[in-house]
Amino acid sequence: LQRAGFTGVEISAGHGHLFHQFLSPWSNRRTDDYGGDLRNRARFLTELISAIRSTCGRAFVIALKLPGEDGVAGGIDLPMASAINGVLADHSENFDLWTWVWGAHARSLYQHLPDATGARHPYLGDIHRLRAEHPTIHSGAIGYLTDPNECEMALNDGTADVVFLGRPLITDAAFPNKAASGNANRIRYCVSCNSCWRNIIEAGALACDNNPRVGDPDEHRELTLAVTHQRHVVVVGSGVSAMEAAHTAAQRGHRVSVIGNIDQVGGKTRLHAQLPGGENLSSVYDYQYLMARQAGVHFIQNRQAQVEDVLALNPDVVLLATGARASQPIWLTDDWAEMGLIPSLREMGQSLIDGIGRSPGRAVLIDHDHTEMTYAVALQMATRFDQITLVTSRERIANDVSLINRQNILQRLFDHDIEHICHAEPDSLDGLEAGRLMIKNVYNDKVSELSDVVTVVHASSRLPNQYLLKPLRANGLEVIPIGDCRAPRSLMAATHEGYHIANTL
């Protein structure tokens, strides 16, 4: 690394990695000089940093990332972390700074990437206390720091001398420059969704929900591909795909009009942002709206767009971003669907936000969705009903989220005593008026009864809202469906598609 031009290295001795395993009394069962008491367990690490210092010299920066609490019974807790610090402090001439991290490659894995389901910057208090034990050694702040003010706080109150940023720099590589120049309002904020982690693990490539330009050589600059011929782009819809396309097209030099059916932007992401753990999502559409306003986008809001509304704007091209709607699951018969007594996930989410009262009894959520918003609604339902039961025909819940987020979801569901039943689906709604829901096992058809049921909610697959597509094309317009209107997908797909479509116009 030094020969390649790097000025330092960080040794990752936390998060369950190899050096962590040597330090931990739970995982280190060795009986030689590298196991047993604490000094022996730390020997591998102390010998390593000594060798690096000897080879690379005093000017080469050596940082240590150490375990604070790993969440493993019999592993490393804060008292043990303090003891490890004491051993390493005796070798402080061989490293320049340290910090502490949480979680391990175990059921506590999710703790190493905290998100909005918990407190902001949750580890700073413990980092401050650990640092205070050896105040002459430089320390770093880390863990769910997404705002420049949080970083400044850690630097000013004695917690740290430097701040480590990972996910926020993926979302906006210019984060430090914008903060330093007084342009924090132009930062594209990390929403701590952990999609970057998932993409690296599952796809082998870096990607971000809120930064479609991640990985571009010039992503730290706000550059756009200027157009040679201005067009009037009408965007129908105001969700995140619509807004990404709108501000990108306007910054390129197009004239852009947005028609939205409410007076706010964000679409279904705005709903998710008001549910447990979703608050950071508001920064996605807040940024998009700010950029759109600054780029001169014209907004027509509180209007459910009809064909004549679009034609009246005389567009050169229409981006159709009218979202998606919940499908009717097979088990939901037409008579029950027509009565409107079994709401979709989104309908229940909106009712919870609107403030429906508390209801005794059991609420059943039929989960065919398996994404984060489903469990955000379930957790909010737990504040309004005596019991929540999740029913899914699949082999586990949260099947379509990353491992790290699934662990967090499971922890919170169990914390709230939310029951989940796998390999099952509704069999009959005949007893529902009497509070009974019959469910059957999808493999052996065995039927069982859920009692005291007061409401049933379905999280089903979604269908594109394309009611304007054919009539607009029949009027000779170029119409491009984007986002969920093209195909219901993830937040990442929505922002990326909006950005890339806008760059083809």
Regions found by a protein language model. Give the residues of each.
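Short, structured coil segments at secondary-structure junctions
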Residues: H134-P135, G158-T159, A295, N314, ...
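Short acidic loop-to-helix transition motifs that present clustered carboxylates
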Residues: T146-N149, I170, Q304-V307, M348, ...
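Rossmann-like dinucleotide/flavin-binding elements
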Residues: V227-I259, I300-N314, A321-D335, M339-V401, ...
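Local beta-strand N-terminus motif with an aromatic residue
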Residues: F6, F95, A160, P315-D316, ...
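Short glycine-enriched, charge-decorated loop/helix-capping segments at active-site entrances
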Residues: G35, H112-T117, A273-G278, D335-W336
